[in-house]
């Protein structure tokens, strides 16, 4: 039986690590829209499956999932390439708004966000965060990544 994709979009779901830590087995049958499948696999910890699924979606959303996969690899150069393929995505303003709210809860993270959401800025922030395990910066980056995931997954399910 396929999983109900709406369960994955809940804001209180598990948080993904900033760097992938291997693959897991799952019983997640592909669901529609196809662009959301890569995100579901990523949330479930199936990095390789998410990578394969993202490669098969030739849309800005597929490129976005592909970029997140490479950001978690971590391969900042490849992540940057895929984010450039995305261009300016409609979820960017919402991700920025959530990032601003999240960072208010983590004042010692000392992050000054750009005026507009910048995927490259977030790649760099994640790279810094993983070098500071247990820090407020790492916790904030994980929360921002989760907000980004929620916005992209919701967009894939119901593009405006």
Annotate each PLM feature.
Residues 60-70, 74, 82:
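Alpha-helical protein-protein interaction scaffolds
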Residues 63, 76-78, 91-95:
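Short, solvent-exposed secondary-structure capping/transition elements
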Residues 1-59, 85, 89-160:
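N-terminal alpha-helical interaction modules that lie
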């Amino acid at each position: 039986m396929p999983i109900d994709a709406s369960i994955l979009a809940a804001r209180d779901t598990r948080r993904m690590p900033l760097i992938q830590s291997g693959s897991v087995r799952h019983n997640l049958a592909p669901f529609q829209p196809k662009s959301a499948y890569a995100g579901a696999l990523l949330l479930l910890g199936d990095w390789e499956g998410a990578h394969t699924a993202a490669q098969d979606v030739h849309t800005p959303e597929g490129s976005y999932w592909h970029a997140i996969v490479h950001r978690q690899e971590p391969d900042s150069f490849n992540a940057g390439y895929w984010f450039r393929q995305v261009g300016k995505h409609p979820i960017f303003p919402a991700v920025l708004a959530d990032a601003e709210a999240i960072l208010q809860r983590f004042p010692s993270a000392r992050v000054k966000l750009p005026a507009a959401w910048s995927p490259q800025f977030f790649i760099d922030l994640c790279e810094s965060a993983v070098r500071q395990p247990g820090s407020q910066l790492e916790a904030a980056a994980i929360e921002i990544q989760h907000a980004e995931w929620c916005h992209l997954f919701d967009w894939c399910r119901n593009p405006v």
